A protein has these predicted regions:
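N-terminal loops that bind phosphate or other acidic moieties
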Residues: 1-320
Length: 320
């Protein structure tokens, strides 16, 4: 019998939030190896294919098989408290044509393991410090560095997950040069957010409300941090719509990408904007990733999609 083993990682989950990349956990490759070892002990004659799949969280770049990688480099960035951290930038080989050849000169797909920059601390007190004092500016810095390495027709995929920092993504925008510069930059590029966590930024079940579970701050302080982050972020979202060169007449609404939307590397840069589209807001799907960076990057022109679906596509799970 032929068997496909395509597991994700196994990580500690205090308060239901995975501490991806932490010491006690198992990366997807290790999970696949353990499953294969146990399977072979019971059914040694089965043919096993191991295809570990990441979800866009910290360490996802390491799960991409070497034979799928055209180049790999490490970019230094700053964490929420300006600590030096390293993230992987991977350029993927183009997928072979039906004849088995690879097309020359076609646009490239890149993956930036940005979630490693804002990884959630295991210590609630350290997480509280990041929530109170942290910034997402380092994320903007590594995204800018990655975009400088990509071509104008390339797609840059950015892995994001839950974090303790909660500045609404303002640091990202500032590091990219401010609203006008960042909007112009992203309007000319294909930037996709690969979300390991689909939590919204605000709301009763949003990232702000969840700060009391993953940090040591009080509910009252978490509420104030969330109110401030959501308010500032939505001011930027509104201003970004005013700058949209495609807007005609009344200000149009930004499309909301959900877990069920078929948006990805092969889709157009912007979804159609019909009158029925919901308005992008702090309570929209996936906007809480990276401390609210997902919300602002989407307002600036990025698309978003569930991380496991994107990573499965990158490793050609459907063809395995």
């Amino acid at each position: 019998m032929r068997v496909l083993l395509a597991p994700g990682g196994l990580w500690p989950e205090p308060a239901g939030v995975p501490l991806a990349g932490s010491g006690p956990g198992l990366a997807p490759g290790h999970v696949a190896s353990c499953l294969a070892r146990g399977w072979r002990e019971v059914r040694p004659h089965d043919s096993l294919t191991l295809l570990p799949v990441a979800d866009g969280g910290p360490g996802s770049a390491q799960v991409i098989a070497p034979e799928q990688v055209a180049s790999r480099e490490v970019i230094q960035g700053r964490g929420p408290l300006r600590q030096v951290r390293e993230v992987d930038l991977v350029r993927l080989l183009p997928k072979p044509t039906p004849s088995g050849n690879r097309r020359r000169g076609e646009a490239s797909t890149w993956f930036l393991d940005a979630a490693r920059l804002l990884t959630l601390p295991a210590d609630p007190d350290e997480a509280a410090q990041e929530a109170l004092e942290g910034s997402t500016s380092g994320l903007g810095g590594v995204i800018g560095a990655a975009l400088s390495r990509t071509g104008p027709l390339d797609t840059l995929l950015v892995g994001l997950s839950r974090s303790a920092v909660h500045d609404g993504g303002l640091g990202v925008m500032d590091a990219l040069g401010g609203l006008r510069v960042a909007k112009d930059l992203l309007s000319r590029r294909s930037l996709g957010l690969v979300l390991a966590d689909d939590i919204a930024l605000g709301g009763m079940n949003g990232a702000g409300a969840a700060l009391t579970s993953i940090t040591s701050i009080s509910p009252e302080l978490a509420q104030e941090l969330d109110r401030r982050a959501c308010s500032r972020a939505m001011e930027v979202v509104s201003a970004a719509q005013d700058l949209d060169p495609g807007a005609v007449g009344p200000r149009r609404s930004l499309p909301v990408v959900s877990a069920l939307d078929d948006v990805g590397p092969s889709a157009s840069e912007h979804a159609p904007n019909s009158a029925g589209n919901a308005r992008l807001s702090a309570s929209s799907w996936g906007t809480g990733a990276g401390g609210g960076s997902a919300l602002l990057l989407r307002a600036l022109g990025a698309w978003a999609r569930p991380g496991a679906r994107v990573m499965a596509e990158l490793v050609s799970l459907s063809d395995a």
